[in-house]
Regions:
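Conserved small/polar residues in nucleotide/adenosyl-binding loops
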Residues: 118-127
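N-terminal/domain-start alpha-helical segments
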Residues: 1-117
Length: 130
């Protein structure tokens, strides 16, 4: 399974990438919203782990554009924005899960497993359905 992490905090992005790789996932990182959107549109990923506050384009705008283009890529928002209105905004934009920082690695991994099991077909199936 291939996961795209869009996170501007390089230290956290590296920690997430290491955690996911130790679990057997392939994990790539983008550090800004614009490159994150470009990569998420590539149809090679099984899951997007997305921060809300990013340079270039915030995670909410990225998600609206991704969903507006018809993408069904599963999205887990992972952000420090913990207010109710932020969570609602993320879910309304199309996030499948919304997890706040700080987080426990076990909870993050459980959300990822759930996203991968219950949300959307694999990239190959998404491509075939077009």
């Amino acid at each position: 399974m291939r996961i795209l992490i869009v996170e501007d905090e390089k230290r956290l992005a590296g920690t997430l990438q290491d955690l996911l790789r130790r679990q057997g996932y392939t994990a790539d990182v983008c550090y800004d919203g614009i490159s994150g959107l470009d990569n998420a549109r590539s149809d090679i990923y099984d899951l997007l782990v997305l921060d809300a506050m990013l340079p270039g384009m915030d995670g909410f705008a990225l998600l609206r554009q991704l969903r507006g283009g018809g993408s069904r890529l599963p999205v887990l928002m992972l952000t420090a924005r913990s207010e109710l209105n932020d969570r609602v905004r993320g879910l309304d934009a199309g996030a499948d899960y919304y997890l706040t920082k700080p987080f426990e690695p076990e909870e993050l991994l459980a959300c990822i497993r759930s996203c991968l099991l219950y949300t959307s077909p694999s990239p190959r199936d998404r491509t075939r359905s077009r």
